């Protein structure tokens, strides 16, 4: 019984290769998985694109850096030419839609409305005033912090005094109002016969005589 089930399953799997629809079911999704519910959108699988290629295509469209193929002369006379789908134009529209979605997503995340595409003079003035107000507020906050630090430093300095500035309890200021003192009188008479005095008298006489001879 088990062999019959295995043979039946293998037969169904081999016969499924003859039909494109059933074979396409086993194709891998965009996330490179065989069974992936996120790979489906609207009953169709997402195409397996390279993110780098998508970013480059968006950049080329925004910068208008496109290499449009030249129209062939043979297709110019084709009556069905207008009904054919231009792949370049189709891809361009696809990437333009992706760019618009990215812009809307960016505006939604940044909180900007869709009406703010064009910056008017009044909006610019409001923005400038707001920036100036913010700068003034920050400067005032910094100034208040500096003042608070200065007050705190002043309080700390007032708690301490210099050791050299302490008052000396034994210090006595100098006296400036002296009382006049009477000169001391010597009651003893001078000794004119003193040897020292006689010596000085002789030296003075010799000096005066020498000065006159010169």
UniProtKB/Swiss-Prot annotation:
Upper taxonomic classification of the species?
Bacteria, Pseudomonadati, Pseudomonadota, Alphaproteobacteria, Rickettsiales
Q: Which residues form a coiled coil?
A: 120-162
- Keywords, ordered alphabetically: Cell membrane, Coiled coil, Lipoprotein, Membrane, Palmitate, Signal
Q: Where is this region: Disordered?
A: 64-83, 106-138, 166-197
**Predominant subcellular localization, coarse grouping:** membrane
What is the designated name of this protein?
Answer: Uncharacterized lipoprotein RBE_0877
Covalent lipidation (N-palmitoyl cysteine), chain numbering: 18
Q: Where is the lipid attached (S-diacylglycerol cysteine)?
A: 18
Q: Where in the cell is it found?
A: Cell membrane
Q: Does the keyword Ribonucleoprotein apply?
A: no
> What is the membrane topology listed in the Swiss-Prot or TrEMBL record?
Lipid-anchor
Task: Name a single GO cellular component.
Answer: plasma membrane
